[in-house]
Amino acid sequence: DHQESADYSKYLEKHFGSPDEFTNEQTVWHNIDGFKRVVCRDEYILHGSPAPHYDFVYCYVDLEVPEDMSDELAKCSGSILIDHLKNEVGARCGSLTANATTLNFVMDVVAGRTEAVKDEYEKRILGMKAMFDNGEKYELDWWPDESGDADPGNEYYKEGYITLEGTRCWKGY
């Protein structure tokens, strides 16, 4: 139903091969690009923070988040998904790069390197986007970016911005 998520799924398949799981609703890869699991869902969720964009790809890592941090992390972004039973954290964004940025923020909060504050989270997402817009590749120590998702020369992102339903959105948050 949602062409954008279908296109991104094809982009992932080009770089990582056929998905490990495939249904009419989603494609799933296990243990790729530094993530425990990557799920591309047939959805297109408008998310207004820190600027309008659409979410449809989920990335997960193993990370034990203390329960007393959950509420504060949830206030930072609706894109942060915590599963205390699995000791797993997910991010739902519009690209692997945005998900890696989101997960890195959670890792930094859990490790005590930063506070769980919405302004800090948004600063990181906007910083990632600014680097991309300036032709700089975004990098994280733990994330290998095997698909070149964070490369500003990536053909998938050549359009940069899209307009849907009257809303100008950045493609790839």
What are these regions (language model features)?
Residues 1-26, 31-37, 43-173:
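Non-cytosolic coordination micro-motifs
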